[in-house]
UniProtKB/Swiss-Prot annotation:
The gene is COF1. It is found in: Cytoplasm; Cytoplasm, Cytoskeleton; Nucleus matrix. It comes from Saccharomyces cerevisiae (strain ATCC 204508 / S288c) (Baker's yeast). It comes from the Eukaryota. Keywords: Actin-binding, Cytoplasm, Cytoskeleton, Nucleus, Phosphoprotein. Its main location: cytoplasm. Controls reversibly actin polymerization and depolymerization in a pH-sensitive manner. It has the ability to bind G- and F-actin in a 1:1 ratio of cofilin to actin. Binding to F-actin is regulated by tropomyosin. It is the major component of intranuclear and cytoplasmic actin rods. Required for accumulation of actin at the cell division site via depolymerizing actin at the cell ends. In association with myosin II has a role in the assembly of the contractile ring via severing actin filaments. Involved in the maintenance of the contractile ring once formed. InterPro entries: ADF-H, ADF-H/Gelsolin-like_dom_sf, ADF/Cofilin. Residues 5-137 form the ADF-H domain. The modification Phosphoserine is found at S4. It holds the Pfam family Cofilin_ADF. Signal peptide: none annotated. PANTHER family: COFILIN-RELATED. The N-terminus is blocked. This is Cofilin.
Length: 143
């Protein structure tokens, strides 16, 4: 349960585990149910295109997302994969929505074991492929 009293629906955890363990999805979009009492799955996708993911982010509302981010380091070490947690809260979203999503984030984030990187986005430049690549690859290759 979060500070806002919002709970994480079981379906949200099931979908996350399907992405993490079964590689069933490329990304999952989460949002609040209509009563604003539970974090539920809004959509899942197997589309490998990062642009397809970005197209799903609403211009005027908040959501959470999990993305199985694949990338290569220096081109010769093979592909790597990191699970990225997004909090999408555009400046144009209603203030109430931003407040509820901000205060409910920790409940979802704590429930999702195995996330390697968190990205907070208020505009599309903050969630661009290059911006996220920079975040997930920090320290990679230096081990």
């Amino acid at each position: 349960m979060s500070r806002s009293g919002v709970a994480v629906a079981d379906e949200s955890l099931t979908a996350f585990n399907d992405l993490k363990l079964g590689k069933k999805y490329k990304f999952i979009l989460f949002g609040l149910n209509d009563a604003k009492t539970e974090i539920v799955v809004k959509e899942t996708s197997t589309d490998p295109s990062y642009d397809a993911f970005l197209e799903k982010l609403p211009e005027n509302d908040c959501l959470y997302a999990i993305y199985d981010f694949e990338y290569e380091i220096n081109g010769n070490e093979g592909k790597r994969s990191k699970i990225v947690f997004f909090t999408w809260s555009p400046d144009t979203a209603p203030v109430r929505s931003k407040m509820v999503y901000a205060s409910s984030k920790d409940a979802l984030r704590r429930a999702l074991n195995g996330v390697s990187t968190d990205v907070q986005g208020t505009d599309f430049s903050e969630v661009s492929y290059d911006s996220v690549l920079e975040r997930v690859s920090r320290g990679a290759g230096s081990h």
